[in-house]
Amino acid sequence: MENKNTFSWVKEQMTRSISVSIMIYVITQTSISNAYPIFAQQGYENPREATGRIVCANCHLASKPVDIEVPQAVLPDTVFEAVLRIPYDMQLKQVLANGKKGGLNVGAVLILPEGFELAPPDRISPELKEKIGNLSFQSYRPDKKNILVIGPVPGKKYSEIVFPILSPDPATKKDAYFLKYPIYVGGNRGRGQIYPDGSKSNNTVYNATSTGIVKKILRKEKGGYEISIVDASDGRQVIDTIPPGPELLVSEGESIKLDQPLTSNPNVGGFGQGDAEIVLQDPLRVQGLLFFFASVILAQVFLVLKKKQFEKVQLYEMNF
């Protein structure tokens, strides 16, 4: 009876341990897979520095263009679309984390004026939902609803990203005004070259950390290389580790200098930022403008009618 209880206890403990292990694995994998779009969120309170530079450029070193399109003016409490285009050659392949080649992903950050935010689902029209597709946007911070991030998402499908935006109503939001506002955007295609902790990814150039002669190049079992460099002056040996992905440019016996590239640059992507302006238009001002135009048109019509009437009178007097 005691052995049976012991067996049951051991079985229960093993089941609990396995369950905990599975939970830890799932949580770990989820955080790793989701880490990319929130790298900036984890390290920076605001994605736009005082200089105007968006912090994503700290990891994506290459510069590439982006294009942002928004309406010239919008009315209060109105849903409109901000369209971000991230152009690149769809035939390009990037180096993945495991060293293999794959398609490029894209990501973006949209910095809206205070009061502007992501439109709620019940305010988005079916036509706009079709343009958005399966994209899922999130706020940069819970208290920064005007800053939106997206990505990584497949570049072939989402090189054009449509953000559904809701404009504020100054009648209900005291910090909103009928003014012209700037909108800032940053977009990247492909993986970054530097991680937030400052370490290099495998999507960049690796340089020699010492001057000397390449004594040995060891190809690692899981990919990548270990390059042994011996300094001819003092015999000191340095080992530079190259992750899988970049292609070697040096060979054994070759003399190299400090900071000389050991690999090619595999990066085919890059980051770009842009800006646009939008006017939060006062409906009363629009109505006043329409009334003015209508008044001008009516005045012109009456003027034409009066002129024709005058011409008829003149013609009558001449005939008389």
Curated annotation (Swiss-Prot):
Domain of life, per lineage: Eukaryota
Coiled-coil region list: none
Claim: Signal is one of the keywords in the record: yes
Segments passing through the bilayer: 286-306
BP term (GO), one: photosynthesis
Cofactor note: Binds 1 heme group covalently.
Residues that coordinate or bind heme: Y36, C56, C59, H60
GO molecular function: electron transfer activity; heme binding; iron ion binding
GO cellular component: chloroplast thylakoid membrane
Subcellular location per the Swiss-Prot or TrEMBL entry: Plastid, Chloroplast thylakoid membrane
Cofactor(s) essential for the protein: heme
Keyword annotations: Chloroplast, Electron transport, Heme, Iron, Membrane, Metal-binding, Photosynthesis, Plastid, Signal, Thylakoid, Transmembrane, Transmembrane helix, Transport
Membrane topology: Single-pass membrane protein
Pfam annotation, one family: Apocytochr_F_C
Signal peptide: 1-35
Complex and partners: The 4 large subunits of the cytochrome b6-f complex are cytochrome b6, subunit IV (17 kDa polypeptide, petD), cytochrome f and the Rieske protein, while the 4 small subunits are PetG, PetL, PetM and PetN. The complex functions as a dimer.
Membership in a protein family: Belongs to the cytochrome f family.
Function noted in UniProt: Component of the cytochrome b6-f complex, which mediates electron transfer between photosystem II (PSII) and photosystem I (PSI), cyclic electron flow around PSI, and state transitions.
Protein name: Cytochrome f
Organism of origin: Lolium perenne (Perennial ryegrass)
Gene for this chain: petA
